[in-house]
Amino acid sequence: MAKDLKFSEDARQAMLRGVDKLANAVKVTIGPKGRNVVLDKDYTTPLITNDGVTIAKEIELEDPYENMGAKLVQEVANKTNEIAGDGTTTATVLAQSMIQEGLKNVTSGANPVGLRQGIDKAVQVAIEALHEISQKVENKNEIAQVGAISAADEEIGRYISEAMDKVGNDGVITIEESNGFNTELEVVEGMQFDRGYQSPYMVTDSDKMIAELERPYILVTDKKISSFQDILPLLEQVVQASRPILIVADEVEGDALTNIVLNRMRGTFTAVAVKAPGFGDRRKAMLEDLAILTGAQVITDDLGLELKDASLDMLGTANKVEVTKDHTTVVDGNGDENNIDARVGQIKAQIEETDSEFDKEKLQERLAKLAGGVAVIKVGAASETELKERKLRIEDALNSTRAAVEEGIVAGGGTALVNIYQKVSEIKAEGDVETGVNIVLKALQAPVRQIAENAGLEGSIIVERLKHAEAGVGFNAATNEWVNMLEEGIVDPTKVTRSALQHAASVAAMFLTTEAVVASIPEPENNEQPGMGGMPGMM
């Protein structure tokens, strides 16, 4: 395929048009009075959203040079979303400001490499200043505030706060679509996996069709159990202890399954058999997790252990186990706390190391099951369009809240970026490096300016007053009042603000140092229809 080339100013101006088109579509959503954007979707209803990264991903421009500019800003939004989970609109506004201001200076003869050095130096100081003014998230109320600001909905903030309170900061919180109008929170405490009883005759409550075991022993093995004789010595010890038993095995079948069911029906003992969760290596890891949580020893050939030699001290215990047709939930496993903490640390290290999103998700699930449980926020709405929009807002709010717990919070509404303006302006630099610092200084004001403009106010007036205001005092665009942002609960996670600034600066610096752009020339479409032999006028 042939290529078309543009150089220096032509290339940068063409890309800038693309940057502006994408950024102008995204930045109308920032702030409490930001608007929505409607996205056309093939084969389904249009999506109405104010989520920056969702809008950015949908934009594809016809002109290849403009499209490259738009793709660069998409990268800012994607990277910020990937690392912080929110702040994509702020990142887009910052990137547009740095690119526009930088390009003016490059056109005037500034050296792009010098500008880049100044931008990098300013961002480094800005991030240090952000961490200095950052405050830890101390309580449930502050977590709710972060979620409420991100989603622009206090109810959503409250649900997220309750979910994190129930399952812990490492717990898994999933967002699902509800069949009703109301949004609800459902919490599954303990370790739950997707395997149910192997026979309905094992249930203890025939009305609900569930098996509830109080203080059961738990046998964990990766073996198939076919012969009842293999587990008979162990079951005799369990009967003497007058306690029920949960058997988690690769499979319980044949003679073993028949005898367990018969003895259950006769009332000799209570035993429930379930298949081991997962497959392959993941199954082995999940069995080890269950063993550590309950204090069991995995009976496996790898350790040279046989079922017929198993004793009570190889079994795990829990305060309660509930087994349905499809799920098994182990509540309050009695495993050693130190072993559980060590296992949690090991899984966290694996999450850091893996590049696979799928593996990361599965490891996160395992971590949650060990660390506390799983919370499900079921999103309700009156229409499918509203449901999609609400779900996106809750996802953003959840990511924002996690980021706040991780690195703390700063004054929201763009206030923190203006609060660090003074610190960045003190950088000693000369020439193009100084110009690079000034590019960042102007960008630090851009989010507040845009929030004010979206509220129908003159942005530059708000920015100037904010520069001279006391640290932490900012403009509440929702009420048009000057307030202490932290006291009012108008906060942003430090991680979100930091990531937005870093990624915007990175892409802006790359943009300014671009000297040539290569685009593909599309092949001309062949509209000629093939001839049909044998017909008049045809070949």
UniProtKB/Swiss-Prot annotation:
GO CC, any one term: cytoplasm
Gene3D superfamilies: GroEL, GroEL-like equatorial domain, TCP-1-like chaperonin intermediate domain
Primary location group: cytoplasm
Molecular function via GO: ATP binding; ATP-dependent protein folding chaperone; isomerase activity; unfolded protein binding
Alphabetized Pfam families for the sequence: Cpn60_TCP1 (PF00118)
Amino-acid positions noted as binding ATP in the UniProt annotation, renumbered to this chain: T29, I30, G31, P32, D86, G87, T88, T89, T90, G413, N476, A477, A478, D492
Gene Ontology biological-process annotations: protein refolding
Catalytic activity: ATP + H2O + a folded polypeptide = ADP + phosphate + an unfolded polypeptide
Cell compartments where the protein resides: Cytoplasm
The UniProt record lists the keyword ATP-binding: yes
Keywords: ATP-binding, Chaperone, Cytoplasm, Isomerase, Nucleotide-binding, Stress response
Highest taxon of the lineage: Bacteria
Protein EC: 5.6.1.7
Protein's UniProt keywords contain Chaperone: yes
Function, in words: Together with its co-chaperonin GroES, plays an essential role in assisting protein folding. The GroEL-GroES system forms a nano-cage that allows encapsulation of the non-native substrate proteins and provides a physical environment optimized to promote and accelerate protein folding.
Membership in a protein family: Belongs to the chaperonin (HSP60) family.
Quaternary organization: Forms a cylinder of 14 subunits composed of two heptameric rings stacked back-to-back. Interacts with the co-chaperonin GroES.
Protein name: Chaperonin GroEL
Encoding gene per record: groEL
